[in-house]
Amino acid sequence: MKFYPINFISKYWRAISIMLLLGITLFSLAPLTELPEAPGSDKTHHLVAYAALAYPASLRRPTGWKSIIILFALYGGLIEMAQPYVNRYGEWLDFAANLLGLLLGILLALGTKKAKGA
């Protein structure tokens, strides 16, 4: 039997989403020992992380994209607000990168569904 990543993601989207939420939370709230080498490079990390977060849920439930944006945007906002309490700093640009990542993940999932013909 051939392995199809899209089918795997669709089947295990909840577990994948929970693991991504845990990973994002750990990386976002771990205290920094030093600033990133390239200023602003963390925006790419935010974009990719939140695109990855939105993709599985959007692939499984493409009509629920509005709920996905609201839920994960609230999560991202709470993470940014919590960062000053763990020797980090929250930024509006990080939150904007999170939102762009969510949109990217949703668009990629919708494109995947359309290409697959589902």
Located regions from the model:
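Membrane-helix interface segments
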Residues: 11-15, 61-68, 91-92
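Short helix-capping/hinge motifs at transmembrane helix termini and TM-loop junctions
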Residues: 30-31, 62, 87, 113
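Alpha-helical transmembrane segments that form the membrane-embedded catalytic/substrate-binding core
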Residues: 49-53, 90-109
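Small-polar-interrupted transmembrane alpha-helices in polytopic inner-membrane proteins
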Residues: 17-28, 67-84, 99
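Structural signal for the C-terminal ends of transmembrane alpha-helices
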Residues: 57-62, 107-113
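"…centered on the first transmembrane helix and the immediately adjacent amphipathic helix/loop
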Residues: 1-55, 72
